[in-house]
């Protein structure tokens, strides 16, 4: 469900249908977030290319950490759960829950803790970021300026995506109900998970 009308998966044609098919091939169903892009499928295509390029220089651990921190700060359930799950595969479920609760688990390096706070502050109010904050990353923790750019880009891109989806009332997919209950409740602090069954571009899921 969303606040605007969207094209149902089995009724889509042209570019919208092609976009749905690509999403379905990745997720196994057409995710709710894709449906609001049915009005502008070219935006989804360009967003996908932009995100891929932003992600390319970073390793999975850093990308998922920054993305999760931003999504959790914005209380976006779907992105928090999706990227929290990915991050849990790298650092463990309990550590992801700890981060969600504002802790700094020992599994994180000192640099990663600083990166985490940097990403949170970008999300809260980027105007308050000072040169000193950037120099803490470069001079104390040894990050390159290119790496600082990458972190800022990853965080800012997630702000765009989550705010767009929440502003249009996009509900997290029902598929998230299959996740561990404790993880779901402690990590997914945002819009409630949809009760609607997933849609497919064909009559039945393969």
List PLM regions with ranges.
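Hydrophobic alpha-helical segments
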Residues: 1-206
